Amino acid sequence: MQLNSTEISDLIKQRIEQFEVVSESRNEGTIVAVSDGIIRIHGLADVMQGEMIELPGSRFAIALNLERDSVGAVVMGPYADLAEGVKVKTTGRILEVPVGRGLLGRVVNTLGEPIDGKGAIDNDGFSPVEVIAPGVIERKSVDQPVQTGYKAVDAMIPIGRGQRELIIGDRQTGKTAMAIDAIINQRDSGIKCVYVAVGQKASTIANVVRKLEEHGALANTIVVVATASEAAALQYLAPYSGCAMGEYFRDRGEDALIVYDDLSKQAVAYRQISLLLKRPPGREAYPGDVFYLHSRLLERASRVNEEYVEKFTKGAVTGQTGSLTALPIIETQAGDVSAFVPTNVISITDGQIFLETDLFNSGLRPAVNPGISVSRVGGAAQTKIIKKLSGGIRTALAQYRELAAFSQFASDLDDATRAQLEHGVRVTELMKQKQYAPMSVAAQAVSIFAAEKGYLKGVELNKVGDFEAALLSYMNSEHAALIKLINETGDYNADIEAELKAGLDKFVATQTW
């Protein structure tokens, strides 16, 4: 075999040109203390706040306390086998979760890993869990509605796309039920949904997932789960993970709805982490930055303008706005809305829906207290027909509450007062609604029209529900074109009013209920 020196030299030159020296410099440290899911690490000189630290066994911790001679980190997962002297490494990365359409219809944990047994997720990339919220210039005012399907909410406390509307109340007052119904109502609206369950029982979450599947809403929803048995770090980070998944749709010119169920448990998990990290406690033993914990999360829910979407998608999507609407849930103790976390979240959000135990126990469900519930920006987003018709509903209920309290002391009431009481009690009865039965815009409009125009006057109180059901069935069969028009346009004019009136007059004259 003859060796050609020219060929050999060319080959050597080629190899030298292609040769790459790759050196990976990663800081290494040693665990010096482990307790309650918190590890203290010595020797990590080059670590960022919030950086992922690699532990043995494909686990990670997140650096939260950067001190002079050590780093305090919280372990994301089991920590029983970690001991003093174990070596750990920095990664140079902050926590990221998978995002994309492949997550729709799936149940994932805080890290975006599937826990529903349906195989791997086909994601469109990764997104950091902590992102700075869009600035003032990048936002657009809220002017499109999110229909929850609840008469009491859509008529009196309307929610717009990009709004943050708090659902607040004691335990067992229907907070989760309201949020789940809002998700079910988005089945055909094009709004993608994210449901974040923090610190709940696994059986409760399984029931929610089953209900979403039964009503055809799971295919449109991402469920992010951090159960009560999981590490405090995972419960604290779950809302941020869910938010990153929702922002994927917002930033691409679509609309998304996210439910945080609930932020009280997230605050408790964060308090636990902070106390274990020896951070100084403040009011109710919460750390000083618990307001920032929720404000930086809820500020990410917004409606962004066309320029933002166009810039983000590099021109792939033009002329479309995107939105992320948030429904945070807060659980109060014995109706105390002046506690630390409830007042914080009330001040951050654009309104709140108060659910009361007394109303719930009296059979008024949803147990919304219209007197202290408010939507600060949703009025601009309300559909035209509901806005026109619902003006008198809130007034009627407010007057009824006032007069009902007064009438307990007054024996003889004049006719006008008695009429107001009669009207108020019927409107209150009309606001009742079954769970998992969200109503369309047209159905709500017909019911409210009947109340506003005095058609409930001669109806017995215990027959109001039957009257409404029979009326909606009649209108759907006899005035299907009108119902379709209202659902599609949400418009209200003299022609629509005349047809609604004619339909109701004929129904009252000819039908029984």
Swiss-Prot record:
The gene is atpA. It catalyses: ATP + H2O + 4 H(+)(in) = ADP + phosphate + 5 H(+)(out). One of its GO terms (molecular function) is ATP binding. Transmembrane segments: none annotated. It is an enzyme of class 7 (translocase). The record marks 373 as: Required for activity. Its EC number is 7.1.2.2. This is ATP synthase subunit alpha. NCBIfam families: atpA, PRK13343.1. Its main location: membrane. It comes from Shewanella sp. (strain MR-4).
